């Protein structure tokens, strides 16, 4: 129910809908300013309707656009045209107008004054060009020069004032008796005057001495004061800020020496061709010298003149060298004796034989000295692997004489052939390769390998590229044969050969990395299969040499490597499974530990087998009773004779041994000696220190260092020399330092806020009916840019034309306005003149009336 006197909501809505106003203009809406006049709209019709084309100029309002353009030009060009040639605005163009009062230095004031005078001269150049009456007052800091100048006559301190000696008081007292009651004697007055004069002279001399001393002191410190006096000026009173990094770098670049012009870099292909051509040329010369072909012809051609005329004076007769045998021309010799050439030749031959005998004796002595020096330097000179040997041979070969070659052939054994060819063909079989190397010494084997590589370089034309792969396989097999059955006498020589061949193995690896790596990897796989058959025995020595090759030829810091990673696993299996019972096995284990530490020197990885092996070596160096056991991990034994294999007996005196490293003979010797025990423990201590330094930054370094402390504390150092004590102290201190470190508590890793997913916009080419030629991307961009420039240029020309018409219209309006004002002035002048003429006529008529 609805309350009485109230209408329902439906009735109210119905009444509102049906209510209409009586005024017909109440429902009409006022025309807004945005709607515009429909007659101002201009429609641009298209001939064809094309799908996909968006036309931006289908309709427009030219009247509104024209009005806006005129309004914009009136606000810009109109205002500029209105104030043209008008100077009703003050502009401060003075120098240093932004500086405050403290910053206005004397140089700024002088520059401002000079600029003002120059502007005045330019503005009134014709009027004041020869004006000498310049009535301007010169000022300085607000004061005129007349106020500043006071015409003082200040005398210097050095000038003596003689007139002060006879002042008025002295004259009155000396000549007139003075004004005092007691009269002085004349002699007393003169004495007093002399004393006073001496006192003043002494004071002046003292002052001069002080000034002289100060001057000498300043002269002595002149060099210290010179930078301050020379650099500090009135403009630089304020302290300059220190030069920043950019200024320092700029000065370094200014005074940096310029690079000198270098030769053009040679292409590797051209370099290989040049090297092959050089070796071929040297080989041809060597063969020619060996056969002695063409030497007599060359000497005869040099000595014998090609042509002798009838007027020849024989000036070069005795300078031509050897002459023809049948030449018996009568001539004077150098001593002025008359004779034939045959007599002089016989004497020269006799003298030459004596000289040759002396030279042979001297040559024999020199060769004996050279052979001694070469034998001494073969062991020491191991670093120069490539350049010294390859370059010295070609230089020495041309200088060798026949007799010296014969003498050297007698002194050197017949099994070693010193004549190395410069061009060597690739051996077809491994037997030929070993036969080629067996004829030469260790130092010459590296030269042979170098020349084989250069003569069979893959970049040369007509060379089989498989030759370098075959040479690499031959070298690996040759190293295997050398080290597999090495003895104590030749093991050192084999390692020297390995160090000399290492650069050439690296060069071969770089020529074809994939093939060479696969070849070496197959050899290592074969060695690993042999090791798995009897994993309790250490592999042969050639396997260890292959590991050393891998360390020198490849990057061992990679996380995964096709050659290094298998070697890594192989070494860990050897160290953790093979038994340690002899001197050879201990030396091999320490050699493998050194190689592994070289592997992880950059990556600092953790290798548990290395730490276990080093703990085992220290464990075997501790003397133990039969019932005593120490915890150790296999392959080392807790008790028994092998658990104290490296322990020194109590009665052994080895404290005087000098520090030595492990020798190459240790790798092929089985018996254990006291000096080897000392060297093994000393090497182990050094390796423990190096291994702990590598894992120093690891989280669990404390757990790796704790087992070493218990073993190092049990070592009896009384029987060991001093250097072992020092190495034991260093290793113990480092282990205690790492064992004292505390591990950080585990904490969840900090998660970075997840970035919002960014979607790349997908651009779609808009189709239009315009056919364009196919162009590259760069040409297409250039064409678009040229088209845009053309459109902008047309628009700029159109705007300039409209601006010109607008300015012409303003000038026309200004001209019309001035003409209108002039016409009004002329009209007003005529009007005033006509009024004046009327009054004048009226006066003249009045005068005529008075006359009559």
UniProtKB/Swiss-Prot annotation:
Polar residues bias (residue ranges): 20-35
Subcellular location: Nucleus, Nucleolus
GO molecular function: snoRNA binding
Coiled coil stretches, renumbered: 190-221, 774-851
Listed Basic and acidic residues bias regions: 344-353
Role played: Involved in nucleolar processing of pre-18S ribosomal RNA. Has a role in the nuclear export of 40S pre-ribosomal subunit to the cytoplasm.
Protein name: Nucleolar protein 14 homolog
Gene that produces this protein: l(3)07882
């Amino acid at each position: 129910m609805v309350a009485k006197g109230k209408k329902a909501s439906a009735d109210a809505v119905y009444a509102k809908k049906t209510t209409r106003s009586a005024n017909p203009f109440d429902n009409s809406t006022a025309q807004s300013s945005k709607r515009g006049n429909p007659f101002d709209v201009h429609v641009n019709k298209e001939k064809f309707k094309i799908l996909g084309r968006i036309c931006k100029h289908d309709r427009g309002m030219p009247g509104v656009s024209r009005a806006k353009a005129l309004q914009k030009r009136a606000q810009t060009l109109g205002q500029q045209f209105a104030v043209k040639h008008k100077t009703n605005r003050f502009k401060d163009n003075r120098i240093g107008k932004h500086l405050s009062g403290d910053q206005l230095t004397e140089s700024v004031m002088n520059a401002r004054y000079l600029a003002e005078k120059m502007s005045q001269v330019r503005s009134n150049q014709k009027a004041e060009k020869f004006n000498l009456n310049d009535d301007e007052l010169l000022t300085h800091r607000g004061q005129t020069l007349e106020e500043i100048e006071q015409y003082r006559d200040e005398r210097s301190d050095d000038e003596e004032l003689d007139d002060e000696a006879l002042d008025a008081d002295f004259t009155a007292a000396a000549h007139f008796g003075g004004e005092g009651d007691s009269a002085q004697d004349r002699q007393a007055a003169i004495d007093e005057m002399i004393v006073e004069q001496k006192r003043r002279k002494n004071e002046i001399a003292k002052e001069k001495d002080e000034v002289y001393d100060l001057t000498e002191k300043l002269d002595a410190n002149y060099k210290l004061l010179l930078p301050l006096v020379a650099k500090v000026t009135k403009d630089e009173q304020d302290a300059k800020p220190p030069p920043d990094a950019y200024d320092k770098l700029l000065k370094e670049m200014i005074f940096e020496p310029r690079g000198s012009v270098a030769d053009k870099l040679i292409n590797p292909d051209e370099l290989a061709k040049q090297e092959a051509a050089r070796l071929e040329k040297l080989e041809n010369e060597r063969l020619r010298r060996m056969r002695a072909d063409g030497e007599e012809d060359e000497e005869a051609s040099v000595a014998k003149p090609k042509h002798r005329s009838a007027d020849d004076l024989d000036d070069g007769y005795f300078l031509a060298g050897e002459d023809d045998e049948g030449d018996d021309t009568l001539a004077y010799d150098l001593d002025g004796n008359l004779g034939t050439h045959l007599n002089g030749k016989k004497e020269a031959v006799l003298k030459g034989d004596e000289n040759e005998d002396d030279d042979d004796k001297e040559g024999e002595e020199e060769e004996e000295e050279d052979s001694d020096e070469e034998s001494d330097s073969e062991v020491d000179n191991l670093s120069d692997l490539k350049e010294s040997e390859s370059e010295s041979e070609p230089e020495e070969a041309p200088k060798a004489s026949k007799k010296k070659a014969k003498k050297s052939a007698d002194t050197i054994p017949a099994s070693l052939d010193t004549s190395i060819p410069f061009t060597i063909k690739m051996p077809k079989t491994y037997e030929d390769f070993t036969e080629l190397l067996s004829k030469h010494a260790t130092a010459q084997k590296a030269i042979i390998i170098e020349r084989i590589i250069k003569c069979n370089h893959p970049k040369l034309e007509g060379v089989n590229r498989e030759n370098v792969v075959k040479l690499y396989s031959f070298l690996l097999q040759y190293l295997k044969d050398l080290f597999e059955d090495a003895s104590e006498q030749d093991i050192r020589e084999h390692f020297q050969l390995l160090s000399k061949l290492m650069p050439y193995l690296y060069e071969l690896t770089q020529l074809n990395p994939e093939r060479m790596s696969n070849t070496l990897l197959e050899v290592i796989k074969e060695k690993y299969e042999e090791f798995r058959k009897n994993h309790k025995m250490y592999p042969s020595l050639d396997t260890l040499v292959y590991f050393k090759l891998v360390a020198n030829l490849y990057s061992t810091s990679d996380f995964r490597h096709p050659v290094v990673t298998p070697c890594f696993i192989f070494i860990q299996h050897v160290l953790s499974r093979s038994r340690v019972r002899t001197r050879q096995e201990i030396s091999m284990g320490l050699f493998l530990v050194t190689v592994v530490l070289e592997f992880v020197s950059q990556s600092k990885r953790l290798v548990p087998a290395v730490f276990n092996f080093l703990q085992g070596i220290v464990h075997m160096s501790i003397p133990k009773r039969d019932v005593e056991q120490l915890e150790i991990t296999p392959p080392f034994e807790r008790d028994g004779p092998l658990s104290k294999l490296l322990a020194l007996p109590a009665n052994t005196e080895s404290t005087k041994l000098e520090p030595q490293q492990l020798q190459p003979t240790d790798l092929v010797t089985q018996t254990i000696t006291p000096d080897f025990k000392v060297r093994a423990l000393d090497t182990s201590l050094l390796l423990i220190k190096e291994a702990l330094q590598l894992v120093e930054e690891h989280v669990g370094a404390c757990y790796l260092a704790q087992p070493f402390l218990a073993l190092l504390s049990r070592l009896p150092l009384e029987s060991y020399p001093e250097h072992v004590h020092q190495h034991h102290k260093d290793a113990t201190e480092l282990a205690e330092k790492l064992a004292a470190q505390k591990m950080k508590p585990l904490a969840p890793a900090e998660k970075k806020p997840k970035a919002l997913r960014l979607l790349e916009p997908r651009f779609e080419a808009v189709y239009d009916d315009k056919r364009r030629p196919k162009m590259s991307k760069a040409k297409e961009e250039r064409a678009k840019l040229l088209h845009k420039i053309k459109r902008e240029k047309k628009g700029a020309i159109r705007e300039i034309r409209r601006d010109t018409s607008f300015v012409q219209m303003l000038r026309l309006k200004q001209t019309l306005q001035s003409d209108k004002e002039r016409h009004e002035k002329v009209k007003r002048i005529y009007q005033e003149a006509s009024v004046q003429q009327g009054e004048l006529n009226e006066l003249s008529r009045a005068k005529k009336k008075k006359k009559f």
